[in-house]
Amino acid sequence: MAFAKLSAFVLALGATVALGESPTHRCLNKRVTCATGQTTANEACCALFPILDDIQTNLFDGAQCGEEVHESLRLTFHDAIAFSPALTNAGQFGGGGADGSMIIFSDTEPNFHANLGIDEIVEAQKPFIARHNISAADFIQFAGAIGVSNCAGAPRLNFFLGRPDATQIPPDGLVPEPFDDVTKILSRMGDAGFSTVEVVWLLASHTIAAADHVDPSIPGTPFDSTPSTFDSQFFLETMLQGTAFPGTPGNQGEVESPLAGEMRLQSDFLLARDSRSACEWQSMVNNMPKIQNRFTQVMKKLSLLGHNQADLIDCSDVIPVPKTLTKAATFPAGKSQADVEIVCNAAATPFPALASDPGPVTAVPPVPPS
């Protein structure tokens, strides 16, 4: 396990506990001061702080919420979701969940169709794993949690240390595709242990996301108008009537979007309008406390696929605290309530009253490369 790999390094670290506390108080509030000066609840987590600094400086361009953050978050999902208890119960290998297989078997798994383009972040992360004594399985989830923390408005995600690396390649076909219908997506996600509402919660990740390969003529095309902030614009803008493609038409898994420069995945469009998921989708619009809470819950669940939490070490306090975001959701300039395609009319989840941004019609710029 990664904990075993790190243990020798951890034992070499200086650690102190505050003196003058009662035994009971110390048991409840024990903090360890690492050799690097930071404090944490568990000595084993001290080894993560140098890795954190390296990631922020050399992978995320000085703690930015940019392309490499988007891709690292995508990798957390693609690595973990290749997990099928149904296959396991049928006597086949169903994948190891969050086991680093995408990096361990980087000559094979990134070539699966659903993983198109993920080889770039895989290759970017490999040198960090090579120079730090951490498993690929842990690094993928650690980098994803750190990356999310760079985005204003995001929740502080959990991180658990100690995942062993994969020993087998998961079967192809376990990662949902943007051209899959809702029934297929919900079935696949259900096999992995996620309910319909949890699928919607996971898609909060698309508020800080962009596509390079759905339409290769326009790399870096974001899924909402604010790809560097973790907000509810994605859920709002996916409910707006599509009017045009940001690049070329006819790409598999893409439908018309409401804004120039914004991409809309077919799967997002369908989930926002399907009777099984539309009300939960609508409930996320302008509801940041809910988005933050639910995304934290579901990302924890994703990161533990294939593992028992009791076997891992909680190092969540190593993850930086994201900046807060106070701006409410608004219609992009040129859009209003008249552009919303409402499917859910449940009294419990009414569509909120929102203002429209002033100025000319919104055009969304691409996410610049790292």
Curated annotation (Swiss-Prot):
The keyword Nuclease does not apply. The record marks 74 as: Transition state stabilizer. Ca(2+) 1 binds at residues 79, 97, 99, 101. Keywords: Calcium, Disulfide bond, Glycoprotein, Heme, Hydrogen peroxide, Iron, Lignin degradation, Manganese, Metal-binding, Organic radical, Oxidoreductase, Peroxidase, Secreted, Signal, Zymogen. Residues 21-31 form a propeptide. Transmembrane segments: none annotated. It catalyses: 1-(4-hydroxy-3-methoxyphenyl)-2-(2-methoxyphenoxy)propane-1,3-diol + H2O2 = guaiacol + vanillin + glycolaldehyde + H2O; 2 Mn(2+) + H2O2 + 2 H(+) = 2 Mn(3+) + 2 H2O. Glycans are attached at residue 133. Its EC number is 1.11.1.16. Ca(2+) 2 binds at residues 207, 224, 226, 229, 231. GO terms for molecular function: heme binding; manganese peroxidase activity; metal ion binding; reactive-black-5:hydrogen-peroxide oxidoreductase activity. GO terms for cellular component: extracellular region. InterPro entries: Ccp1-like, Haem_peroxidase, Haem_peroxidase_sf, Ligninase, Ligninase_C, Peroxidases_AS, Peroxidases_heam-ligand_BS. The keyword Signal applies. Belongs to the peroxidase family. Ligninase subfamily. A versatile ligninolytic peroxidase that combines the substrate specificity characteristics of the two other ligninolytic peroxidases, manganese peroxidase and lignin peroxidase. This is Versatile peroxidase VPS1. It comes from Pleurotus eryngii (Boletus of the steppes). The lineage of its organism: Eukaryota, Fungi, Dikarya, Basidiomycota, Agaricomycotina.
